[in-house]
């Protein structure tokens, strides 16, 4: 089956899901779309897609149903809740779940779907809104290899790299590792920008110089300037990263491992959420230094 033959549904049209859906449409795929808020189904870049009133409608008569929703409860709701997709998915179809959820939630969903002849792949992505728009997301997949090959043509539209880590749940575990790295790198850049500013250094030159050295990172290259200007354009929502760190910390607990940096960053994010900054980018961690920098 060629990619143009695939019948595809998509549930979740948020900051990451919407540009993913737009890229699928631009690639010529017929697409059924649903989002729980119903606000973006008629987006002009989705012209030609079929807007669906429920996840069940989006999953009816499709070969692949893509999910990109906010958390474990949302995945459970759109699959198994009232008007959930599981009731309408055809035997032999594949659920491609690009949400970031607990590995145990992914495993449980896969088992429930398996009983009705539906395959499930956990395929969280990394790369933020920039990667979603450009179609260069990194896909971290867990699940049956044959099912993964069936959906690979879609993954190659939304992602620049597709990595398979084994059984269902492994993709989510790798995403947990990714979010630990994001926590440390963003927090370090925020601290470094605060220190350099307090010392009176020419920070644009500092960032340019350090970006090509051993301290260079994606966060430094792409978020330092915004931090210095007090601007935090949305790449990945701070509140969602806080949720993801909770998943990572639970995974660490399960193997008797303490993650002190991630614990601290999660506490800092909780403070910022309490101040009303949860919908800003993770780089808003720099706000913790506003009063001293």
Name every feature range the model reports, one short phrase each:
Residues 1-67, 93, 98, 129:
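NAD(P)+-binding Rossmann beta1-loop-alpha1 motif at the extreme N-terminus of oxidoreductases
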Residues 31, 51, 120-121, 162, ...:
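Hydrophobic beta-strand scaffold residues
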Residues 38, 55-60, 64-65, 71-137:
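Rossmann-like NAD(P)(H) cofactor-binding subdomain of soluble oxidoreductases
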Residues 100-180:
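Rossmann-fold dinucleotide-binding core
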Residues 134-142, 167-199, 210-222, 240-243:
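Active-site-proximal catalytic alpha-helix in oxidoreductases
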Residues 172, 181, 216-281, 293:
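Interdomain hinge/lid region at the active-site interface
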């Amino acid at each position: 089956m060629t990619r143009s033959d695939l019948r595809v549904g998509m549930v979740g049209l948020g900051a990451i899901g919407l540009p993913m859906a737009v890229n699928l449409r631009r690639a010529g795929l017929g697409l059924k779309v649903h989002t729980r808020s119903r606000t973006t189904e008629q987006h002009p870049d989705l012209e030609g897609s079929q807007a669906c009133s429920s996840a069940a409608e989006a999953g009816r008569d499709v070969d692949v149903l893509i999910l990109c929703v906010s958390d474990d409860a949302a995945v459970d709701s759109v699959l198994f809740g009232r008007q959930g997709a599981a009731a309408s998915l055809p035997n032999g179809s594949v659920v491609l779940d690009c949400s970031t959820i607990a590995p145990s939630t992914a495993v449980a969903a896969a088992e429930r779907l398996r009983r009705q002849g539906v395959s499930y792949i956990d395929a969280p992505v990394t790369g933020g809104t920039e990667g979603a728009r450009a179609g260069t997301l990194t896909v971290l997949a867990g699940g049956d290899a044959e099912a993964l090959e069936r959906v690979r043509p879609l993954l190659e539209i939304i992602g620049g790299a597709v990595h398979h880590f084994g059984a269902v749940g492994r993709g989510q575990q790798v995403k947990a590792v990714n979010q630990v790295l994001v926590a440390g790198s963003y927090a370090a850049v925020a601290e470094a920008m605060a220190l350099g500013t307090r010392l009176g250094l020419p920070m644009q030159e500092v960032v340019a110089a350090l970006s090509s050295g051993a301290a260079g990172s994606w966060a430094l290259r792409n978020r330092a300037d915004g931090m210095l200007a007090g601007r935090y354009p949305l790449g990945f929502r701070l509140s969602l990263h806080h949720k993801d760190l909770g998943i990572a910390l639970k995974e660490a607990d399960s193997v008797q491992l303490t993650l002190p940096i991630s614990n601290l960053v999660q506490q800092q994010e909780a403070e910022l959420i309490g101040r009303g900054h949860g919908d800003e980018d993770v780089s808003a961690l720099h706000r913790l230094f506003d009063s001293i920098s």
